[in-house]
């Protein structure tokens, strides 16, 4: 991997492209230390240097766990479902996307009960049920926090835009890269950040249909011409003379 300072500058440039620094018009008191400045429109901007530092801290915490299957990634926000699943795929963690079943971390008689050693959430406000239950079970929490995110029961806050699909994907991408690097699994990260982006199923289906139509056009498939050729072939077969109504026995009987 490139030197730390070069990697830091490259990562910050990616964060700017993915709009990770754009916060909201509200700010929590505990998030003020991560704010860079406030624009004329009233939007608070996040200090990306502190974001990068918090990613390094969170990655070191995750890397200390022997079995990464004990790390649970929770995301009820739709834009965070695919990044959470990809993070789990590349690190070996366990992902829980969609609705979080109450009692998963506290009720031992439920089928989905689990006792993770670490919890990662995409948004502490949306995933508040998981954060509250982790406080009952004494489970550390790492959270992607926007300027208006509550930090109660959050142990490590990664300041970022946790509402944009590009920003969420980039955060999980960088976190997975650092975890694998610290655990010695890879020296070169070949995975593209685009793989972590959330994709709309309807948009993906429409694009697939459009690609098939373009492929057919490129192959020169003429549906109308094919129909005309089929009709001509049918007429040709229909004009063939012969006793098609005779039985097979008559044909064999008259054979020399």
Swiss-Prot record:
Keywords: Cytoplasm, Ribonucleoprotein, Ribosomal protein. The keyword Ribosomal protein applies. GO terms for biological process: ribosomal small subunit assembly; translation. It is found in: Cytoplasm. Its main location: cytoplasm. It comes from the Eukaryota. GO terms for cellular component: cytosolic small ribosomal subunit. GO terms for molecular function: structural constituent of ribosome. Transmembrane segments: none annotated. The keyword Ribosomal protein applies. Component of the small ribosomal subunit. Mature ribosomes consist of a small (40S) and a large (60S) subunit. The 40S subunit contains about 33 different proteins and 1 molecule of RNA (18S). The 60S subunit contains about 49 different proteins and 3 molecules of RNA (25S, 5.8S and 5S). Interacts with ribosomal protein S21. Belongs to the universal ribosomal protein uS2 family. Required for the assembly and/or stability of the 40S ribosomal subunit. Required for the processing of the 20S rRNA-precursor to mature 18S rRNA in a late step of the maturation of 40S ribosomal subunits. This is Small ribosomal subunit protein uS2. It comes from Cryptosporidium hominis.
């Amino acid at each position: 991997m490139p030197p730390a300072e070069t990697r830091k500058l490259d990562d910050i440039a990616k964060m700017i492209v993915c709009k990770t620094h754009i916060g909201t018009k509200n700010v929590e008191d505990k998030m003020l230390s991560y704010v860079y400045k406030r624009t004329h429109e009233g939007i608070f901007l996040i200090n990306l240097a502190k974001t990068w530092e918090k990613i390094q801290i969170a990655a070191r915490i995750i890397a200390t766990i022997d079995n990464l299957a004990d790390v649970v990634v929770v995301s009820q926000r739709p834009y965070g479902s695919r990044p959470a699943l990809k993070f789990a795929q590349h690190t070996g963690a366990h992902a829980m996307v969609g609705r979080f079943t109450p009692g998963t971390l506290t009720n031992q008689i439920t089928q989905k009960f689990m006792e993770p050693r670490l919890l990662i959430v995409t948004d502490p406000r949306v995933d508040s049920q998981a954060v509250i239950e982790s406080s009952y079970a004494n489970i550390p929490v790492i959270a992607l926090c926007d300027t208006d995110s509550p930090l109660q029961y959050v142990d490590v806050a990664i300041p970022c835009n946790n509402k944009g699909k590009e920003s969420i994907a980039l955060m999980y991408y960088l976190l997975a890269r650092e975890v694998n690097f610290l655990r010695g699994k890879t020296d070169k990260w070949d995975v593209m950040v685009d793989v972590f982006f959330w994709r709309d199923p309807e948009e993906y289906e429409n694009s697939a249909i459009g690609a098939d139509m373009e492929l057919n056009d490129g192959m020169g498939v003429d549906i109308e011409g094919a129909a005309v050729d089929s009709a001509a072939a049918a007429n040709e077969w229909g004009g063939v003379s012969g006793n098609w109504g005779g039985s097979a026995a008559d044909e064999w009987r008259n054979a020399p």
